[in-house]
Amino acid sequence: MDVEQEDAIKGWKIRRLIEYLEKAKGNGTSLISLIIPPKEQISLINQKLTDAHGRAQNIKSKAVQKAVQDAIISTKQKLSVIKQIPPNGLILYCGKFIGEDEKTEKQILEVLEPLRAINTTFFLCENTFYTQPLRDMLQEQDKFGFIIMDGNGSLFGTLQGNAREILHKFDVDLPKKHGRGGQSALRFARLRLEKRHNYMKKVAEVAINCFIQNDRVNVLGIVLAGAAEFKNELAANEYLDQRIRAKVVTIIDVNYGGENGFNQAIELSQVQLQNVKFIKEKNLITKLFEEVAQNSITVCYGLTDTMKALEMGAVETLVIWENLEFIWFKLKNPVTKEESTVVLSPQQATEKNHFQDEANQCELNIVERFALTEWLIDNYKNYGARLEFVTDRSQEGSQFVKGFGGICGFLRYEVNFEKMEFQEEEGYLDPDEDFL
């Protein structure tokens, strides 16, 4: 899985967790939010929890007191099996709350490592969970690469949220232009061009080391910046890896090289970087619209066709709306013992006819139930597909959700769904043969 895909999936999981946590309402101050930085000692955290457990004795309501102390005990038990705080720290949520039906009591114990290192300790017992650190994670998720170059050297860095990192830098000694004539001037000009050429080649090589990981670019976009024409020459240079060139989002002039140039490039590129995600989304969905307009059979859209194509292994890139609401079920027939899968809308999931076998007059048992997006995240690689998320915050994204069901696939080979549908109706296809 490439870095971009991995970050998109992590982002989706964090958004879902935020939604779940923010719906929870505890009994009194029974919901624990705990943030632990990477170098903190677990023994010190345990002592804080022990002190909080003692203070909870002063809570007048016995029900609230028990809920708070139970949450503290569960938190301590969870920490007891953690040998060491992960490199980026730890975020823990624990407590019991009343479900949306206002009757069922639910318990949550969620532990996750932040995407980046945290440096503060935070402990809160309240009637709601403190989710701001998770929201900060989402805002800081996208990483961008920077190459700053001038006649004195180059700097390679990344920007992620407000955190900048210098990956590599080196100096260069390029000869200045020679003002004299004659043979020496020609030799000097050749030497100057050769050194400039070698400089460009070295920058391109270092860029690969900094921004290519597992044969893929490890940043969402790349900014080329510098004084004079160096940055433009690099963009056009044959040595610059095509994968890196494809990720260049802007080329900007800065007045300085080195770290000062890096800071200025960050400041001047903010608007372009904010638009990168939506540009990628727009291009992806526009490509779908163009293929559909040409009646292409190398794309599919809508739940039924896309799931068929995925199970066939025909989907190269699966595109889904981040808030897709379908539910995936695995069902078992208690009479025949056969298992089957079905994907339903939330409304369909409340209708009993989808869980009945009329032939055997029995009700199908639900073996597994997942949000479809969750199931796709866990299984898309098994079908050889890539996974892309889109929002409905752009005009194209909104049209994709409303007109195409929020799910589509770009296919690795042509699939004739009309012919498949006809064969299924005529009984030519064996459903156990994965549509092949």
From Swiss-Prot:
Summary of the function given for this chain in its UniProt record: Directs the termination of nascent peptide synthesis (translation) in response to the termination codon UGA. In L.striatus UAA and UAG codes for glutamine.
SMART domains: eRF1_1 (SM01194)
Family, per entry: Belongs to the eukaryotic release factor 1 family.
Subcellular location: Cytoplasm
InterPro entries xref list: eFR1_2_sf, eRF1_1_Pelota, eRF1_1_sf, eRF1_2, eRF1_3, Peptide_chain-rel_eRF1/aRF1, Ribosomal_eL30-like_sf
GO cellular component, one term: cytoplasm
MF annotations from Gene Ontology: translation release factor activity
Signal sequence range: none
Pfam families linked to this entry: eRF1_1 (PF03463), eRF1_2 (PF03464), eRF1_3 (PF03465)
Taxonomic lineage: Eukaryota, Sar, Alveolata, Ciliophora, Postciliodesmatophora
Record key words, sorted: Cytoplasm, Protein biosynthesis
SUPFAM superfamilies to which the protein is assigned, alphabetical: L30e-like (SSF55315), N-terminal domain of eukaryotic peptide chain release factor subunit 1, ERF1 (SSF55481), Translational machinery components (SSF53137)
Subunit structure: Heterodimer of two subunits, one of which binds GTP.
Protein name in UniProt: Eukaryotic peptide chain release factor subunit 1
Record flagged with keyword NADP: no
